[in-house]
Amino acid sequence: MKKIILALVLMLFSFCTLGQETASMHLDDTLSAPIAAEINRKACDTQTPSPSEENDDWCCEVCCNPACAGC
């Protein structure tokens, strides 16, 4: 009985490990683009200049905002 339980535990463990490796290998650009956009948005939110500064394109320069001409 102990051998059966051990075999089941090992099978479950290997299934979980292989499932995580397979998922991480199949990440494509469709998933990484929204993540990059979120990181850029957070960087823009944390680096807002003071209202006295006259640089209107600060977010484009800091974040490479896709709405701007680009970097």
Swiss-Prot record:
Disulphide-bonded residues: C59-C64, C60-C68, C63-C71
UniProt subcellular location: Secreted
Name listed for the protein in its UniProt record: Heat-stable enterotoxin B
Pfam families: Enterotoxin_ST
GO molecular function: toxin activity
UniProt propeptide residues: 20-52
Position of the signal peptide: 1-19
InterPro entries assigned to the protein according to its UniProt record, in alphabetical order: Heat-stable_enterotox_CS, Heat-stable_enterotox_STa
Keyword Disulfide bond among UniProt keywords: yes
Annotated Gene Ontology cellular component terms: extracellular space
Keywords linked to the UniProt accession: Disulfide bond, Enterotoxin, Secreted, Signal, Toxin, Virulence
Function, as annotated: Toxin which activates the particulate form of guanylate cyclase and increases cyclic GMP levels within the host intestinal epithelial cells. Could play an important role in pathogenesis.
Similarity comment: family membership: Belongs to the heat-stable enterotoxin family.
